Amino acid sequence: MKEQIQFTTSEKYKDNVVLRLSFEFAIRIVQFSEILEEKRKYVIAKQIIRSGTSIGANIKEAQNAESKADFIHKLKIALKEADETEYWLFLCNSINSYPNCDELIKQLQPILKLLNKIIGTSKNNIKQ
């Protein structure tokens, strides 16, 4: 069985799936960026670590939003960062001298889907 990674001390967040997935993804992004830096791919490593770790940070920030609109705004930022990260990962996969990152791309997909679903549901709740 996979060891549970601690991503919060708060009971409020412990069952937050998108927060947990984005934290686990950020760990993998840091590890991948370290591999890129070892291969002297500094520019891409910096871009990937910035956008890839920002996803979870924005999701966490959204948990303390001042309003529903603020919550949606912060999750949209997380979604933009996820889209940017996906771009960099596909770019890496397209260049032979870069390590393969199919697993990272696969790990990112449920985060993208959850963010889109949460944003859509939250927008619908505002309209009601």
Residue positions per predicted region:
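Short, C-terminally biased terminal segments at protein or domain edges
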Residues: M1-N58, A65-Q128
